[in-house]
Amino acid sequence: MAKKHTVSETNETISAVITALGEGAVGIIRISGTEAAAIGDKLFRSASGKKLTEHTPHLLVYGHVVDEENSKIDEVLAVYMQGPHSYTAEDVVEIQSHGGLQSLKTILGLTYKMGARPAEPGEFTKRAFLNGRIDLIQAEAVMDIIKSRSEASLKMAVRQQDGQLSKKIKGLRRNLLDIVVNLEAVIDYPEEDIEEITFNTVSEGMEKVKQELEYLLKHAHTGKILREGLQTVIVGRPNVGKSSLLNALLSEERAIVSEYAGTTRDVIEEQLLLGSVPLVLVDTAGIRQTEDYVEKIGVARSKERLDKAELAVVVLDGSQPLNEEDEEILNAVAGKPCVIIVNKGCLLYTSDA
């Protein structure tokens, strides 16, 4: 059997299905830890008759999963990855079986019988972090890649996983340490004529650090939008066409549309990808003065979501002049990124004045 490789704090071997649960063509089970190689050799029978660990690591091998009685469970491909050259930096075995729930459940159950325990959510990535294969920023990037909703967010997450952000932060740390060294030199050797030179060096160094931090903060906000979506709130007084706009953007009848004012009484939230930018699109109750208790709650929620909005889409009724409710809404979005849409253009209101 192959030599065991692991640097984890625990000697426990873990296993789990790492593909999405549900019926599919292929499902993958990952086993990681000190006993992964031994479990792989017990579980897998290659077409050549050789043990899995006797094959070249990192190459897929064709064969079958077998149970304790040597009965075939499923036709699979298996791969052995010797630590530390694996995702977790431990010995890892991955089995690619048919994606049926029963097949995956049976194979996973066999790994438990052979000494593995169920992996906790995120535990493979946790082990990769604890074993030093990735840092915390790269670990967070793994989930960002999985949850990417656009090509732009995927590219950003891949750059983060490659360590580009980590390198920038390490560079900042080096610059700050250089500044500390210069300051300590002035303190430790006050008799030396280096104070002016050191002051200039420290000043230039701090300015460089400041510029780099401003750059990172600017792009952090962009990254947050790409990961979580731009909070976009559609607002307006009742019956101006907010719900119709939401339905048109989503290309489906998501919100009830009626000729009667006040149809929307609660917040409706949906996801929309606009080009490469994900939006969290929020349709709100029409903002107006009302005595209806339920509608009052809806109006209060509308104002609350508007306060938190990163982009406001204000819908105005082009068939009527601006009124106090319109002006209240326009005042509320002052200073906030805003798009103003004049609806009902075919009935455009014109003043006689």
Model-flagged regions — what are they?
Residues 349-353:
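Conserved small/polar residues in nucleotide/adenosyl-binding loops
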Residues 215-291:
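Conserved G1/Walker A P-loop phosphate-binding module
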Residues 151-235:
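Flexible nucleotide-interacting loop at or near the entrance of a catalytic core
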Residues 331-335:
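Short, conserved loop/helix-junction motifs that constitute active-site signature segments
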Residues 1-155, 159, 163, 339:
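A glycine-rich (often HGG/GG-containing) alpha/beta subdomain
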Residues 309-323, 347:
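Conserved Switch II/interswitch segment of TRAFAC-class P-loop GTPases
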Residues 293-301:
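Substrate-gripping "pore-loop 1 plus following alpha2 helix"
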